[in-house]
Amino acid sequence: MKLSTDLRAFESRIGHAFREPDRLLRAVTHASLSSATRPDNQRLEFLGDRVLGLVMAEALLAADKAATEGQLAPRFNALVRKETCAAVAREVGLGDVLKLGRSEMMSGGRRKEALLGDALEAVIAAVYLDAGFEAARRLVLRLWGERIAQVEADARDAKTALQEWAQARGLPPPCYEAVDRSGPDHAPIFTVEVRLGNGETERSAAGTKRVAEQAAARALLARMEARDD
């Protein structure tokens, strides 16, 4: 089959020409337009999520050989969460080539974060099936670019990440409260609780309120993202 002009342009933007063009067509086809003869991208999204995770895990291990699992986990989550995938999808104009049903199109489907993130993962899977893991790896590293280099700083700012997570789900900004102080005056220990608008909370203790807030936010964000998965 031959791809349309807009899909050929999309191939150029992501730097991969498909040997089997139908794989790309399936990757950009939403469930709202699927049929017996036109499969949607849900199964590809499932596979692409795993390919993306493997590429990112390898990249993070290579970038910081001394990092612990606890240090790597928030960096990994920052790179693979739906908000990041959607941002990358927008940068390559994925929304412009999505194949949507009328109702999904009328409701702004081309701009929906979850839909864009899922479709990008489907594209990653399509490249993997079309040309193998190395091609998919090159694609991911190229599209994520400086995000991988910046992820350590981004992951440290867990309060911002948690606020973005909450806002993306229509929740108010997280609330932080110092609930305890212990230890001597010269070396106090502050316990801080963070609370989301959905009632979820997490506590953490540290030598300063700022560090305790960041630790509590990081722990709560990791728990919420694990539930999203």
From Swiss-Prot:
Record: active site: D49, E121
EC number from the UniProt entry: 3.1.26.3
Places the protein is found: Cytoplasm
Organism in which the protein naturally occurs: Cereibacter sphaeroides (strain ATCC 17025 / ATH 2.4.3) (Rhodobacter sphaeroides)
Transmembrane spans: none
Organism domain of life: Bacteria
One GO cellular component term: cytoplasm
GO biological process terms, semicolon-separated: mRNA processing; regulation of gene expression; rRNA processing; tRNA processing
Keywords: Cytoplasm, Endonuclease, Hydrolase, Magnesium, Metal-binding, mRNA processing, Nuclease, RNA-binding, rRNA processing, rRNA-binding, tRNA processing
Family, per entry: Belongs to the ribonuclease III family.
Function: Digests double-stranded RNA. Involved in the processing of primary rRNA transcript to yield the immediate precursors to the large and small rRNAs (23S and 16S). Processes some mRNAs, and tRNAs when they are encoded in the rRNA operon. Processes pre-crRNA and tracrRNA of type II CRISPR loci if present in the organism.
One Pfam family named in its UniProt record: dsrm
Domain DRBM per the UniProt entry, residue ranges: 157-226
Name the record gives this protein: Ribonuclease 3
Residues binding Mg(2+): E45, D118, E121
Catalysed reaction equations from the record: Endonucleolytic cleavage to 5'-phosphomonoester
InterPro entries with a match to the protein in the record: dsRBD_dom (IPR014720), RNase_III (IPR011907), RNase_III_dom (IPR000999), RNase_III_sf (IPR036389)
Main location as per UniProt: cytoplasm
